[in-house]
Amino acid sequence: MKQSVKFKALYWDIAADLLFPPNFDETKKYPVIISTHPIGSCKEQTSGNVYGQAFADAGFVVLVPDASFQGESGGEPRYIEDPSFRVEDYSYACDYLVTLPFVDEKRIGVLGICGAGGYSINATMKERRIKAVATITGANYGRVMREFGDPIANLEAIAEQRTAEARGAALRVDQGLYPTVEAAKADNANIDLLEATKYYRTSRGEKPNGVNKTLFSHNATALTWDAYNLAEKLLTQPLLVIVGGIPGGFGAYRDGFEIVRRAASTKKELFVIENWSHYDLYDKPEPVKQALDKLIPFYKENL
C-alpha cells in the first residue's frame, strides 16, 4: 500500500510516497526508514521502486521523498542541488514522521543512495532522531564536484553567472548526463557516466522527474562542502556502507572506505559487493539482493 503525502519544508512542501508493510495496522507503532534518492533522481526510481518497496515488504513503514526544488516537491527556482537544503530535508522528514500515530519516533533510520549517501551521513550527524544510517554507493558530493574540473575556475564562473542572472539573464540549467547511451560511448565516458546514462536515459530506469538537471548558479555550496566533516566526532549512530566492487569515476568505492574509517560509530561496517558496479546496485537483481540481505537485518537490529 502506498500513499502520496506532502509535508512542510522552509517555505514550500516536500512531496513523498509513504509505503506501508503488509497487513498494516494503524493502531500499532512501526519503525520507519527514510529512503532518499540519488542526485538528479526522483522518488519513483531506485529509492522508491527498489529499496523502498523492499523495506515495506520486510515490515517497515517507508518514507520516500523528492528532494526540495526537485521532482514533485516545491521550491523555486527549480533544480537547485544544494547540500544545505538536501541535508535539512531529513529534519523536515523527521518533523513530519513524529506527527504520525503509527510511527515509533525512537526507531527512525535512513538510507541514502549515491549522492544521498553523503547527505544521509551528514544529516545523521546533526539529526539525533535518526538512529541508524545506511548507504548504497554513497558519494561525497562536495568531493565529486571539486574533482570534476577546476574548482576555483568553477567558483569564478558561478559568480559571473549569478551576476548575470541578477541583472536579468536567463537561468543556466545544466544537464548532468549524455542524452543517449550512444553519445556517452562516442565520448568515451567513464564507467559511472556511461552506466548512469544507461539507467536514466533508457526504459530501464527512466522516469519523468528523474531529469538530472542542476541550476549552475547555485553550485557554489557543493564545491565548498564536505559530507564527512566532523564524522570523527559526531557520527555515532550505527552505520552500514555498501559499495560495488568495481570502482567508478564518481568515487563511491573509496568514499565508502573513508567514511567507515573516520566515523565515530562503534557499530560500523563496510560491505563490498564484488564484481558489480555503482549503477548495478540501483536495480540489478543479484547485487540488490546482496545489499538487502545486509540492509534489512541491519535496520531490524538497530531500530
Regions found by a protein language model. Give the residues of each.
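Catalytic histidine-centered segment of alpha/beta-hydrolase-like enzymes
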Residues: W276-V288
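Alpha/beta-hydrolase active-site loop
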Residues: I80-P101
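Conserved alpha/beta-hydrolase
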Residues: A54-G74
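Short beta-strand/loop motif that positions the catalytic acidic residue
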Residues: L234, V241-V243
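N-terminal cap/lid segment of alpha/beta-hydrolase-fold proteins
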Residues: M1-K28
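Alpha/beta-hydrolase-fold enzymes
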Residues: I121-T202
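Conserved alpha/beta-hydrolase "acid-adjacent" motif
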Residues: G248-G256
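The serine-hydrolase catalytic nucleophile loop
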Residues: G40-Q53, A67
